Amino acid sequence: EALVTAKRQGILEEVLACLSDADQMPFRDYIAMLVQTHIVHAHRRWEEMGLVAQTLRETGVDPLMTEAIERSHRRTVDAGIAPANGQVPSLDDALTILSEKVIRGI
């Protein structure tokens, strides 16, 4: 969705350049970092995904994946798990928090 929109807006290379930050560390570490920082930054990321969804719609793209990410982040926000001190937890602690307080079974 994002890349189609970037292409339509003529900014594909700029978007790809921003995404290249992921190349700076091993993929395993990058994924762990995303999970760990999700605990702290879910609220900001949720708001950002809302803006992304709006931009996609304005470009004529149905934001299916973006809305799923937005809902996932909202679930974390609603769980109220962001640490008051802003401390990023270890991967193990982050997964425990998500498992016990955010991601419920059906």
Features from the language model and the residues they span:
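Helical "substrate-binding/catalytic lid" subdomain
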Residues: 1-87
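Short, basic/aromatic-enriched C-terminal tail that caps enzymatic domains
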Residues: 86-106
